[in-house]
């Protein structure tokens, strides 16, 4: 499978968005009712996926006002010959409306309240779905090295040359969009 027909899997937080949905949703929740600050530590006892689901079930983020990275949107708009997958550790309840708003993804993979789809969990899920080296992955952070270990190619976004070098030890770096 060549890079031209491998699915392009795109991270949300820090990659497609110049922000993080977890922080956006926490701020929205606390601005609506500051008393939730006392519940969040108890939610954390049940894990990150649980926290994300609790936030997602209580807030709505307007997809049209989120801070998208226009360079990533342009790649997605011009990459129509292969499947595009939004793959994120953010909760599906918040992510699906974003994907629907953009209309650029054929599939969404996201945290679900039980599994935090981050790092090695994300890498394993993508490899199970598309096969080892059967997808390209666009990400922005150290945690994405665990995904690039399974990917056919890497697109590094909003980070420096150090992450590009580290990614190149995992897979072929197809592009670098620095911060």
Language-model segments: residues:
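Active-site neighborhood of HAD-like aspartate-dependent phosphohydrolases
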Residues: 1-56
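C-terminal cap/substrate-recognition subdomain and adjoining C-terminal extension
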Residues: 1-7, 64-179
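TOPRIM metal-binding catalytic domain and adjacent DNA-binding surface shared by DnaG-type primases
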Residues: 50-71
